[in-house]
């Protein structure tokens, strides 16, 4: 066995792990679990939205406009990705069929809607249960 392989095996051994100070172990474990937790949260949100039939096929702007014309009045989300910059809320009035578009702002890792900060779209949706009645339109540019 070469010198590099033996050093690698030595680093991976239980004894080497025991020799690492606890502070570094905690940082490593915390980072590992935090990253897994974030991925889990993203998958959970995506699964939840798909179960609610919020996703639609890829459409261009004209396709979205046509779909909104035939859609009933209500609130709709238009996004290319739940966590990306392009995120709009569309409110269609049932009486006259007009629509108001509001671009939602991302501030760091938060979404800012009406002056309030949300860590992710899931929190906003949880606090606004009436929006669940209407579809979320996934729009891929």
UniProtKB/Swiss-Prot annotation:
UniProtKB keywords: Early protein
Induction (free text): Expressed in the early phase of the viral replicative cycle.
Highest taxon of the lineage: Viruses
Family assignment from sequence similarity: Belongs to the asfivirus MGF 100 family.
Function in brief: Plays a role in virus cell tropism, and may be required for efficient virus replication in macrophages.
Protein name per the record: Protein MGF 100-2L
Organism whose genome encodes this protein: African swine fever virus (isolate Tick/Malawi/Lil 20-1/1983) (ASFV)
